[in-house]
Structures are given as structure tokens and as C-alpha cells.
Amino acid sequence: MKKFLLIFILFILGIRCYAQEKIPDVHIITSKFDRIEIIRMNSATDLLIGLNEAVQKRNIKNAVILAGIGSVTDYHFHVVSDKNLPPAEEFPKASVPKDLISVQGYILNGRVHAHITLSDENSVIGGHLEPGTKALTFFIVTNGVLPDDLDFEYLDNYKY
């Protein structure tokens, strides 16, 4: 019984030490693209729905969203609104025409995490893409597809 208790205590201490290991402030993953995919979406297409559809159709597990252009009739995104963790968020949404001047982000284990930048003659706005951003003319998005064996689901988790 004493031996079991000693092993149990050492096990618990080991878990505590492992949990307290410092995660590096900078984490680097090296890879190459398997392929480049260019996705075109027609007028009235929802950008996030279209990206998710392309990910499913082309069986994309991991990718870098390299570029995106187009124009919108409606937009919806979210932005952080304070310095706390987890941060408070605001969800701007409007039905106005704007140019889509960039899309970038990642596909992490099949999950789209995209940010958009929009402009008109007076302002530039943007944030984390939400459903409801719809094409006026078209969207073109370029994805650099990465190997499936990369494990970086955690990259966009602030708790990591």
C-alpha cells in the first residue's frame, strides 16, 4: 500500500510539473505547400459558407489563406474590444457596398479562420469573418494547401 501511495504521489507531482512547463513565446512550424487552390465565388455567395464548401469539396485539412479580393453587398465580422482574456468582442454588420481588399487566415484541421479587410472611399475596416459577408461582383480566394499531418489546431487558441 505504501508503494502504491508513493507511486501515486509521484504521478501527481509529475503531472503538475508537466502542466507548469513554460510554453515558448515563439513557436515555429516549417512546411511546404502541397498545392495552391484558387477559389472563385459568384455574386451573392456568402464568403464563409463558400470557403467552408471549398474546404469540404477539396478535402482540405490544413491551409494558409494567402489572398482574397472582390466586393461585398453585406458584411459581418467580429473584432476584439478590450484587453482582457478572453477578450470582449463586437460584431459589426451592415448592408453596404465595399471592396474586399484582402482575405487572409488559416484552415486548421478543416476549420476556417479567416480575416477580411474592406474599404470604400472614406474608410478601411475589417476583422474576423462571420457568416453574412456576401459577394457583390465575385470573390477570389487563394489557398496554399499544407500537408494533412501538420498538427496545428491549437495555433489560434490564446490559451495555448
Model regions and ranges:
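N-terminal intrinsically disordered, cationic/polar leader segments
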Residues: 20-45, 49-56, 62-67, 73-113, ...
